């Protein structure tokens, strides 16, 4: 049913963004600095949210809407909208869910790498570029 699909997408979307925010939060050691790393992610998470509304009120069967709805950060917002609007089949829902479930462990692995490289630093905020540079050397 549609309600079950919406709940599944909510859980998958929550997991994707929770892992991303966890990785970002590991870059700071002081509570006061959390907003500086979380604000860009908040803004990025608003893009799929707003696009899902804009596309749902426009041409619901556009190629852009269809392609974006398969990308993991966009799928939790766009696939439920496409399902409710009747422009998505259960096969498309399953494919998008499969892509998101493959993406999630990769995201967790990347977040874990960021965390392990950033946790050794204390004091000032660790720039993401520095963490990624350490990853290249390791």
Residue map of PLM features:
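A structural motif at transmembrane helix-loop-helix junctions in multipass membrane proteins
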Residues: 7-44, 56-58
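Alpha-helical transmembrane segments of multi-pass membrane transporters/translocases
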Residues: 4, 8-9, 87-117
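Hydrophobic alpha-helical transmembrane segments of integral membrane proteins
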Residues: 43-59, 125-126, 130-138
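Short helix-loop junctions at transmembrane helix boundaries
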Residues: 1, 27, 82-84
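Junction motif at the cytosolic side of a transmembrane helix
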Residues: 23-29, 102-138
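Membrane-interfacial helix-loop-helix junctions in multi-pass membrane proteins
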Residues: 53-102, 138
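Membrane-embedded alpha-helices and immediately adjacent juxtamembrane helical segments
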Residues: 18, 22, 45-48, 55-60, ...
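Alpha-helical transmembrane segments of multipass membrane proteins
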Residues: 13, 17, 21, 45-52, ...
């Amino acid at each position: 049913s549609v309600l079950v699909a919406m709940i599944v997408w909510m859980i998958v979307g929550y997991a994707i963004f929770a892992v991303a925010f966890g990785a970002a939060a590991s870059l700071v050691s002081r509570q006061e600095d959390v907003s500086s790393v979380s604000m860009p992610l908040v803004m990025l998470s608003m893009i799929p949210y707003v696009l899902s509304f804009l596309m749902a009120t426009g041409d619901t069967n556009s190629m852009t809407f269809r392609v974006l709805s398969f990308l993991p950060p966009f799928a939790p917002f766009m696939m439920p909208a496409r399902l409710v609007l009747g422009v998505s089949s259960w096969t498309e829902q399953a494919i998008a869910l499969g892509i998101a479930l493959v993406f999630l462990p990769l995201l967790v692995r990347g977040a874990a790498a960021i965390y392990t490289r950033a946790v050794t630093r204390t004091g000032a905020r660790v720039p993401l570029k520095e963490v990624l540079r350490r990853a290249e050397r390791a």
